[in-house]
Amino acid sequence: MQDWPLRVMRLVDHAEREHGDGEIVSAWADGSVTRTNWRSIAHDARRMAQALEAVGLHRGDRVATLAMNHDRHLTAWYGAIGMGGVLHTINPRLFDDQLDYIANHAEDRVLLYDHMFAPLVEKMKPRWTTIDTYICFDPPADWQGDQAFTDWIAPHDGDYRWVEGDEREPCGLCYTSGTTGNPKGVLYEHRSTMLHALAEVAPDCFDLSTNSTALPIVPMFHANAWGLPWAAPLTGCELVLSADYRPDKMVKLFREEGVTHSAGVPTIWMTMIAHIEATGDDLGPLKTVTIGGSAAPRAMIDWFRKRGIHVGHAWGMTETSPIGTLAGAPRNWDQMTDEEQLGWTARQGRVPFGIELKIVDDEGQELPRDGVTSGNLLVRGAWVIERYFKFDESATDADGWFDTGDVAAIHPDGAMQITDRSKDVIKSGGEWISSIELENAAVGCPGVAEAAAIGIPHPKWDERPLLVVVRSPGAEVCEVKIREHLEGQVARWWLPDAVEFVDELPHTATGKLSKRLLRERFREYRFANAEAMTGRD
């Protein structure tokens, strides 16, 4: 057989050659909408590759972006990698010290950014010591700052051949959100990225085809936008990109562009569902949503199912490129009751080919796949980290297993269910209480917009759960109503010893609930009557 390295620019070539007229729509932050296609994107990416070489970039150099989702950002992905560089997507929601650290640690040479982030860029320039070229994607007409992207690539004709090489060369770099310590870099290879894309388009994963219209609500700066910028050119599907995540704008975009497939974290779906419930709007021909980043509440899954929209519950992390599991339908799906289907979808799904999972106890002994036993979740596979960028030591054990930091159960059919993060499990009387399951049950209570459960020290039980709740707008739900709702949904001894109401919960730069910040906020909190334990005495 021929030697045909799995380099990701072959995906762009394929989309250009076989699906050149496939449309790419960009909804910009200023409300404007632009349209292009795979052929034009590929041509402009070649022009950008020429522009990068003209400013002295070489194979392996890092090219950074600080931008939302739009076609110029997509062009930058392909142009940077096509000239042999490594694309480093920077999350603008990080703290200044983190932005300082990752750009310098990555030794970025070029930064392309959105005008909306210009104040941030100007503030950080003195601290970014390795970047010598700054390009603005979308400057206003009276812009007096860095060179505009279109002007930068204008002198180049696009007569360019992508840099070839080994499929194990790096092509992408993402940093973890760094909830403790400095963020860590994860370096992606051409081969791992290609295999991830091939797995992602399968029916049991994102189920994309040429006839799909995909809209990732995942930012392109977060975990490779869940791989959709590579899965889309593989199929040649139409791609809709939005820099504006306001729910009314998103719902309008779904409907007008005929979006069939989408992916996002629960918080963004919550805002869209609330908008639809308040206005009577709809999501058009949407067929499939993928929900990940944190566990999707059963109430959310049920909301989509009642509207004929398939829910793929996913799990992954920056270290897994990011897809690790996805909830495609099992073989006996049609024989399941509605309640059984809902329960199955609430799990994080099964692995695609290329990924392996197991759970172990604290001594490293493998635990059974019985759907009941929980343990530390380990993963290995074709697109799983081996070591962090610029780290000498391996991130895995001798057999290649990476400790995810999650606690999970694996069912006999292979379906995995996250029960908690290892550091978020509430340890009460020698037993584990899943904060995730408690939170998801609470969110199903009318009037509860968001909920978080954390462990509070207790003199008898070690820890007991505190439930922190954000009410829905205009709702007057109280602790009694929430406790009544939870009765029968969780074990009685899981019931929170107190419920506190707040205006908002803290989130990380990637939109996940920050239990660390929440624990800091309630560090001195103690239950009013610590000896009167509901359901335990």
Task: Label each region the model flagged.
Residues L11-N37, A141-Q144:
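AMP-dependent adenylate-forming
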Residues L11-V12, Q50, A54-V55, G82-D151, ...:
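Structural core segment of the AMP-binding/adenylate-forming
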Residues I24-H70, L74-Y78, F95-D100, T150:
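Conserved AMP-binding/adenylate-forming core of the ANL superfamily
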Residues L52-L57, H156-R168, L173-L215, G227, ...:
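Conserved adenylate-forming
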Residues T65, L94, L111-H115, S262, ...:
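AMP-binding/adenylate-forming catalytic core of the ANL superfamily
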Residues M83-G84, M194-T213, F221-T260, H275-I276:
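Conserved AMP-binding/adenylation subdomain of ANL enzymes
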Residues L234, E256-G264, M270-L342, E356, ...:
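Gly/Ser/Thr-rich phosphate-binding loop
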Residues V351-L378, P412-D413, A475-E479, S514:
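Conserved beta-loop-beta connector loops within the AMP-binding
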